[in-house]
């Protein structure tokens, strides 16, 4: 704990306390005893700099700090002497005619000598300026202040006037004047008041008992003074038998001192407490007048005592009264709204628990303390529990401290739902004490307890780490103390140290595998969990990719896990995500530069898995990256693989995506050539019908083709296929998230392992269109084939391509869609559009056809 600021503050008040004592604060120690001695420096002023007022001189060392421990002892001793002096003065005046004898006389002289020493000592005691709250140590200012305030009264209360009279006259005189001058001794009672005020602020003592002691001392002193004064009236009255005490004790002056004093105090107490037994009462007018004023004074004193005691008692029961009022209000609320008994019990149980927990003042206290102290408290209270939780085993102390400082302790009553099934909680809970039931319900059957969490159990981590709703209801079985940690705080702590984040995630995955009493589907989902048994679930990206949980997958990749790790079958996370249609997971993996060309044990790439499972959007995204990394062989590799396997369905899907049917693979073979070599006649026919070049393939496969389908048959098939056969493209436009990933990855250049290469400058999807020569209304009568091209970025580039492909003057042509609408902007053309290039001849032909049909 940092105590430098406290030490400097206390040392400013205690250092330099030589002469009268410089211990205590000057030692630089800090404890509860020194806490009440702190002097706060002004705002913006260093504690050791200007916390003192005045200029230090050569005599500054003899100035005593009022906060010095030795001076405090002296001051306490003076309080004892003041109490003695205040008690003995009324007694001597009333019962000894102000002329003490024997031991009392000697004691009075000794006490007066001590008070004289205190007067001299006060000239060397620094003081705290009431305006600036600074310690003034300048002796000149100290002397000036004392002489102008308390000096005269202190001297007057110390002078032995009767002794001076004896020295001057040589006679011992008993005069009322000496008794009146003796009243000045009561001036010293201010020290007692200051003493009790200081004790009330000292946290080492109980405020209630200090306050009670103060009230009792005030009451007893007033009883003593009133009794002495009442006896003095009776003793000085000329007709002593007509006094309050003379009526009871006729010759009271001859009675012992103890009987007389006891009788006086007895009368004073019975009168003050308004009991008034009547055995001792006023017998003359003077006593009656005194009683009148005494009883009026008692009214005020009684009100003062009752008010103080009431405040002390009520303050102690205030919380209980507020609690009872809140319970009454809650009961009325339940009754008005006809809530069921179960809810009523939960409400009342929560309020009772809250009342009991408030006595600890945990959070309220923590909010008042500085961060360093809070950290120490949390470390002492929570760290021993948190470090043993399975989720945080092996995590560094630094990250653990970061988390425990953000944990909030809570008390939850029994039978309270902390997390409801299918809810996505925002917090992670750690069980410190009590038991929590894990309950499953399918909505129709009764609830079933599948597990019980005890001390150091944790729940809510599934939602925090995998962003999945909680598959179970977590309900307290007994009174539970829980530590609540916000998900945001957990993720912030994990991001602060990536290696600890890996440890937490591995602990989480390992624990989920070992939980035989829980369903694996809670983590993987029903489909993914079916692929693994409970004892053989890989704790890596493959498991998370199978869940489709892109957020958790991204967390794993950010902490450094390899995106290209494979299972026993060679499948990577991209293979699994692509085959299951998890587009978000695919995008996350692509952002982390995974290799799209990795093949599994069966020779399948993620691109093949996507098209085989008919996930066209994912195929479109992956094909973009495959074509970037292998621009000349991406299409050929896929078509040849489908042809080699004789997979007609997949081949049709590939052709629907507009892949060039004569594309070559890495070995220079086309799909038709592979189909002929493998003897897949149906595949060969499909390829020919979709525009494959027979002559190009036949030159390499004359012998193989004879076994399956003849080249002549294929050439004959070419004649029967539809001329200008258009390709029907089913590629959807990329989603905004996919387009963002394409732009991000495409603009980042080379990545790790050299797998990612630059894409198009605009980073967008490659739209392709079919262009035909002729008017769309008469296109079916044309015998000229169309062309499938990549759409350029501008209309000027588009017209240049038209001139090259269709051999027409593009400046004198119109571009129309299949509905006959003219297109004059490249921005309105979409992927898979069919465009028609219309010349003047085509327009004339259409006009002539309209005139003939009209006639």
From Swiss-Prot:
Extracellular topological domain: 97-105, 171-179, 236-262, 283-285
Membrane topology according to the record: Multi-pass membrane protein
Residue ranges, Cytoplasmic side: 1-75, 127-149, 201-214, 307-855
Claim: Transcription is one of the keywords in the record: no
Intramembrane ranges, chain numbering: 263-282
Any Gene Ontology CC annotation: endoplasmic reticulum membrane
Subcellular location: Membrane
Domain KHA residue range list: 768-855
Chain residue ranges for the region called Disordered: 1-24, 744-765
CDD domains hit by this protein: CAP_ED
Compositionally biased intervals (Gly residues): 13-24
Segments traversing the membrane: 76-96, 106-126, 150-170, 180-200, 215-235, 286-306
Assigned keywords, A-Z: ANK repeat, Ion channel, Ion transport, Membrane, Potassium, Potassium channel, Potassium transport, Repeat, Transmembrane, Transmembrane helix, Transport, Voltage-gated channel
Binding site for a nucleoside 3',5'-cyclic phosphate: 391-511
Coiled-coil annotated spans: none
UniProt-recorded Gene Ontology molecular function terms: identical protein binding; voltage-gated potassium channel activity
Keyword Membrane among record annotations: yes
Pfam families on file: Ank_2 (PF12796), cNMP_binding (PF00027), Ion_trans (PF00520), KHA (PF11834)
Family as reported in the entry's similarity comment: Belongs to the potassium channel family. Plant (TC 1.A.1.4) subfamily.
Functional description taken from the UniProt entry: Probable inward-rectifying potassium channel. Assuming opened or closed conformations in response to the voltage difference across the membrane, the channel is activated by hyperpolarization.
Stated name of the protein: Potassium channel AKT2
Taxonomic classification: Eukaryota, Viridiplantae, Streptophyta, Embryophyta, Tracheophyta
